[in-house]
A protein has these predicted regions:
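Carbohydrate-active catalytic/glycan-binding domains of CAZyme proteins
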Residues: 1-123
Length: 123
């Protein structure tokens, strides 16, 4: 999915990847038809845009998934424009118990919401 970043002329594209679990990688561009550049620190299994390697669960919540799958950033508005606010990133995704298996259409996926934690960023 591709989003316009609020207050900029920049676009963000996120794409789901798989190996060894589902996660998201990200690219940016100043033009939808232009060159897309991987977002540093958000472009691999080890350092994903969203994945088990950079997702933490709230205190007291036992980690219940390794998959960050079928996600979408929540938009900054309610019209057809896919604009996101970089200061209020929220990512709705589905995950499942890694011990579950069987028919894909019957897997016990459940929804969750990621929010950007800026507490570890330097001012």
């Amino acid at each position: 999915m591709t989003y316009k970043i609020k207050g900029t002329d920049t676009y963000l594209t996120i794409i789901e990847a798989l190996s060894p679990a589902r996660y998201y990688r990200a690219w940016i561009s100043n033009d939808l038809n232009g060159e897309w550049t991987p977002v540093p620190g958000a472009d691999s299994w080890a350092t994903p845009f969203a994945g088990i390697n950079n997702v933490t669960f709230e205190e007291g919540v036992e980690p219940w998934t390794r998959d960050i799958s079928h996600g979408e950033l929540l938009r900054d508005g309610y019209d057809e424009t896919p604009t996101i606010d970089p200061n209020n990133l929220r990512f709705l995704y589905q995950g499942r118990d890694p011990k579950s298996g069987g028919n894909y259409s019957l897997l016990p996926y459940r929804l969750a919401l990621l929010t950007l934690d800026r507490s570890s960023e330097e001012d």
